[in-house]
Amino acid sequence: EPRAKAHRKRNAANKAKNPYKEACPLIQVIAGKKGSGKTKRIIEMANTAAKDTKHDIVFIDDDNRYMFDLSREVRFVNAGEYELENDQMFMGFISGATSQNFDIGQIFIDAFKKLVKADLSTTEWVFKRLEKISEKSGVDFILSLSEDPADLPEFIAKYVI
C-alpha cells in the first residue's frame, strides 16, 4: 500500500511536468499503423522521462535497432534475446523485471504485438495483469502497438493517448 500511495503522489506531481500523462496514470498505449511515428514518439517519451524523474526507466524492444537512440540513463532491454514464445512468457518477463528492481518508475515497451506473440483480442488478461503490477509496484507502462486505433478492442482503446 505505501508504494501505491507514493505512486499516486508521484503521478500527480509528474502529470504537470509530463504532457504524456493525459489518458491513464498506469498504462498508456501509442497505437498507429506501421510508419506512423510510434517508435520515435515512445523513444522521445523515454528520454524525457529519464530527465524528469529520479526513478529508473526501462525500455524493452524486440531487437537492438533503437538502442543508441535512447539516453544512457534509460536501461535498454532486448527482449528478443530471451526467446519469449507467448504472452504468458512475456508477462513472466515483466513480473521478473518489476520484482527485481523497486526503483523502476516507467517501463516503455516498443513493438508490443511482436513481444506478446498473441492476437490482441486475447490479451485482455495481459492488460489486467499490467494494471495489477502497476498498482502494486508503482510502475507505469507505456506501450506501442502497430494497429489502427479504431481497430483496437475496447479494453486496449481506453489506454490510447
Where are these regions (language model features)?
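Generic alpha-helix initiation/capping and coil-helix boundary signal
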Residues: K5-K9, T39, F127
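Hydrophobic alpha-helical elements and their junctions with loops/disorder across both membrane
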Residues: N11-A13, T53, F141
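Conserved catalytic network of the ASCE P-loop NTPase/AAA+ motor domain
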Residues: A49-D52, D69, S99-I104, K132-S137
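Sequence-level detector for tyrosine residue identity
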Residues: N18-Y20, Y66, Y82, Y159
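Short, Lys/Arg-enriched N-terminal segments with co-localized hydrophobic residues
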Residues: E1-P25
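Conserved P-loop
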Residues: L26-G96, L152-E154
